[in-house]
Amino acid sequence: MIKVKIVRLKEKASLPAYATAHAAGMDVSACLDAPVTLEPSSSALIPTGLAIELPEGYEAQLRPRSGLALRHLISLPNSPATIDADYRGEVGVILINHGREPFTVNHGDRIAQMVVSKVDRVAFEEVDSLSDTERGEGGFGHTGVASKAE
């Protein structure tokens, strides 16, 4: 288990927490002075009242909560949102309402999941060509939608 330093920028901010013993993501909560209503097709930056210090070589990703997506069509437009190890500002969550009804976020609502992962840096090697594969340049749905097991 890695240690991540965290500062409550507001006393009432909730620390991220795993909901179950084997959860990959920690629930992240809104830290609001007043409710925020997302009208259909609108987005807002929701504060968490938290700042974190990740160890070098790690990132945190913010991801949508499946229940909010399923029941209310609330998501993160930049999912996964990356928090870099050298960022020290407040963690904010951009929420978007893809639904047809207004959705209100209240203080303490669990609005996203945070997954902390190790990341490797890469060094690109510029070459004249790439090796051939069966797939080649096929992309963007080239394998179709129907199951191949039919």
Curated annotation (Swiss-Prot):
Enzyme class: hydrolase
Catalytic activity: dUTP + H2O = dUMP + diphosphate + H(+)
Region Disordered, residue ranges: 130-150
Position of the signal peptide: none
Coiled coil, from the record: none
Binding-site residues, substrate: R65, S66, G67, N78, T82, I83, D84
Gene3D superfamilies per the UniProt record, alphabetical: 2.70.40.10
SUPFAM superfamilies with a match to the protein in the record: dUTPase-like (SSF51283)
GO BP, sorted A to Z: dUMP biosynthetic process; dUTP catabolic process
Keywords: Hydrolase, Magnesium, Metal-binding, Nucleotide metabolism
Top-rank taxon: Bacteria
Pathway: Pyrimidine metabolism; dUMP biosynthesis; dUMP from dCTP (dUTP route): step 2/2
HAMAP family: dUTPase_bact
Function (record text): This enzyme is involved in nucleotide metabolism: it produces dUMP, the immediate precursor of thymidine nucleotides and it decreases the intracellular concentration of dUTP so that uracil cannot be incorporated into DNA.
Stated name of the protein: Deoxyuridine 5'-triphosphate nucleotidohydrolase
Organism: Chlorobaculum parvum (strain DSM 263 / NCIMB 8327)
Lineage: Bacteria, Pseudomonadati, Chlorobiota, Chlorobiia, Chlorobiales
